[in-house]
Amino acid sequence: MEIRDNNKVNLCFAFDNLRKELSRPYGILFTNNKVFLDFVSKSIQQGFKVITVGDYVSRVLEENGIIPFLEVIDGKTKRSIPQHRAIVKNKEYRVTNEAGKIQFEIFEIIENILKDRDGGVVFVNGEEDLLVIPVILSANNGDIVIYGQPNAGAVVIIVNEMIKWRVRDILEKAVVEEC
């Protein structure tokens, strides 16, 4: 396939073959909001970035005075309940991403945002759940990535080389296809 002269590569990683593997939490599962918020606050005090993937966890932090460096949201919780944002950031980005996939271009977008000193919000038209993968690969060691585990709580991943290796291993098992 010739892609050299295309402005946009229309390829995705597809994860249909990995649904079971991806359904379990890959970090610390917090079921108590007070313990969760205390942990996040201490991480911020130590100078690490907080990155959220999901509307509900982003909103819980915001309502408790914690503003994530980067939020990846789609405006919904459990795929249908609209979420209204209380905080507006200076830098907002919009991407499209199908459920069960990650578009190649999103890796570069997230990497660039995490290099920027201001962070921002990525609004996803589609599904944001799997964008934990490019977030972890682009985050610095020590940063914390938070996502919601439906009907369970919030999962916190402390980024390190072991986690990045695990995420790269999952990515290698994904199927590359046209979006």
Swiss-Prot record:
Its EC number is 2.7.1.237. Coiled coil: none annotated. HAMAP family: Dephospho_CoA_kinase_GTP_dep (MF_00590). It is an enzyme of class 2 (transferase). One of its GO terms (biological process) is coenzyme A biosynthetic process. It holds the Pfam family DUF359. It comes from Saccharolobus islandicus (strain M.16.4 / Kamchatka #3). One of its GO terms (molecular function) is kinase activity. The keyword Transferase applies. InterPro entries: GTP-dep_dephospho-CoA_kin. This is GTP-dependent dephospho-CoA kinase. GTP binds at D55, V57, D74, K76, E128. Pathway: Cofactor biosynthesis; coenzyme A biosynthesis. Keywords: Coenzyme A biosynthesis, GTP-binding, Kinase, Nucleotide-binding, Transferase. Catalyzes the GTP-dependent phosphorylation of the 3'-hydroxyl group of dephosphocoenzyme A to form coenzyme A (CoA). Belongs to the GTP-dependent DPCK family. It catalyses: 3'-dephospho-CoA + GTP = GDP + CoA + H(+).
